Amino acid sequence: MLEGAELYFNVDHGYLEGLVRGCKASLLTQQDYINLVQCETLEDLKIHLQTTDYGNFLANHTNPLTVSKIDTEMRKRLCGEFEYFRNHSLEPLSTFLTYMTCSYMIDNVILLMNGALQKKSVKEILGKCHPLGRFTEMEAVNIAETPSDLFNAILIETPLAPFFQDCMSENALDELNIELLRNKLYKSYLEAFYKFCKNHGDVTAEVMCPILEFEADRRAFIITLNSFGTELSKEDRETLYPTFGKLYPEGLRLLAQAEDFDQMKNVADHYGVYKPLFEAVGGSGGKTLEDVFYEREVQMNVLAFNRQFHYGVFYAYVKLKEQEIRNIVWIAECISQRHRTKINSYIPIL
């Protein structure tokens, strides 16, 4: 028997939840991956993908087929699915889905700013932007010279506007300041998304809060790793960490003081969930920290589908689909470059 909250969930969101679960069921299987890694050419890869749920998604492409074309078309397909969810959603699911797009918008803004810094054409950079993070004012990003310019002229009408409150400055947007801006925006965004999920309560909070806590901790580890050997001070590094997660607050304080990977690993050793991840880095498989984080992310997102009546399945599906796209692109790159020794280094999902 459904309780009140679950009954209302089904009335407003049951159709879309059923749909996204159906989409998840169409993710590539382990057998699909076994078949893909045996392909000799990108045309072979295309033919096999046609036998899966991807169907004729490359039908309109003329030869030669490239990895970039495959990547672009898979992203477009994911974006089409997501837009369908969004166009048929009711509040508060609509707001949840908007939060999901913000991370892609941040990445696109940073990509465009770096492109402008390197004097690349806007058209070239727009082609590399993620379709889930597109917004009307994107093409004007390259005119901004400071974060204040960026906010006042371009982003004030976008969902990113609230995250700029802690980022306003008149500093010139050089490479370092652009990277700092990315991390500050992500910090504000993750904190806001976490607060939204926590305040929503119910199963959505139970599923999404641990996922976002992991994302916050992952960002803290990666920020720390990337700051070694740079001019970023320990004090400034600490201001970039999201203020929630398993590491908050003591682990973040210790991370801020870390001076190399071993010291960072020592911090992770205090946390049962992160110790085995760091122990898996390197070894016979040659895994990077990024690899083990992706593997953990996949596990958490697969588990999200074990619960019902929550928004987390939409987040989890998009993340799993993105990992599938990364897997296919990795296999396609290995085939294209005839570098087959690492072709099995993808991250299985199902």
Swiss-Prot record:
Superkingdom as given in the UniProt entry:
Eukaryota
One Pfam entry name: vATP-synt_AC39
Q: Which GO terms describe its cellular component?
A: apical plasma membrane; early endosome; endosome membrane; extracellular exosome; lysosomal membrane; membrane; phagocytic vesicle membrane; plasma membrane proton-transporting V-type ATPase complex
Q: Does the keyword Transport apply?
A: yes
Q: What does this protein do?
A: Subunit of the V0 complex of vacuolar(H+)-ATPase (V-ATPase), a multisubunit enzyme composed of a peripheral complex (V1) that hydrolyzes ATP and a membrane integral complex (V0) that translocates protons. V-ATPase is responsible for acidifying and maintaining the pH of intracellular compartments and in some cell types, is targeted to the plasma membrane, where it is responsible for acidifying the extracellular environment. May play a role in coupling of proton transport and ATP hydrolysis. Regulator of osteoclast fusion and bone formation.
Subunit and interaction comment: V-ATPase is a heteromultimeric enzyme made up of two complexes: the ATP-hydrolytic V1 complex and the proton translocation V0 complex. The V1 complex consists of three catalytic AB heterodimers that form a heterohexamer, three peripheral stalks each consisting of EG heterodimers, one central rotor including subunits D and F, and the regulatory subunits C and H. The proton translocation complex V0 consists of the proton transport subunit a, a ring of proteolipid subunits c9c'', rotary subunit d, subunits e and f, and the accessory subunits ATP6AP1/Ac45 and ATP6AP2/PRR.
Name of the molecule in the record: V-type proton ATPase subunit d 2
